[in-house]
């Protein structure tokens, strides 16, 4: 992901800052040598050049030679100064543009972050996140995501699961018509139930997800357009992570992987390192991974790898999702996992 920059100390910068004074130095050395060696040059000329003008007819002083050389050198020096001025102006314009981009990104980021914090602190948002994390996802003793909702092998209809304010039987009628009458796999049933649980609280925290999605989309767009350098990009992602509790990180992760509404957010999360890196996953640095449903391979796509492969994947998936204009094709997408697995 790293890019070569024209910074002070780099070979590119040294070439630009070194070549002009070097040329000027060489020119002045040439003038000095010509003035110093003028008599010797006359003797050499008289001894070695045939069909020459008589040396006696050459009557030129050092001062006159200096005037001639200066008249030749002056345009060269003027050109060099002009080119140096253009280089300085270009550098100043680039620095000014970079500063403007940085200021614009800073204003937008903190403006959106302020809106996000307001949604985050609403009581209904807090209650919804608590339900999703403690009951829908991580209830070790109940019908929860990490327990596969206690679905038996077979038709798997005989189990309960929690909605936001109620306890429901799993029923095939909850699913869209394309699943009716089909024997769904255990994994498909788990994905359908967790998606239904998120749908049940969506109206209470839709703005929370939308603003968070917008923050990531804005940062990614600026980074892709080189309006934000890698260091600033990582810094903003780090700041964003610090605003989230471990419970929120898990809820955002499950929403991005398993809920169809979270497909766009899942794509924007690719290559951000919001959830941490491989070392963080091994020690549950930022959150406890909901095992065994979530494995490290599920998280690897969100890592900011040094080669930038995941960033490229994000761009490709953004284009792929944008190119889908067939409603039936879009409806066939179950969630982020099914969307990216289609390219595997």
Swiss-Prot record:
Keywords: Plasmid
Domain of life, per lineage: Bacteria
Function: Provides resistance to bacteriophage by abortive infection.
Protein name as annotated: Abortive phage resistance protein AbiC
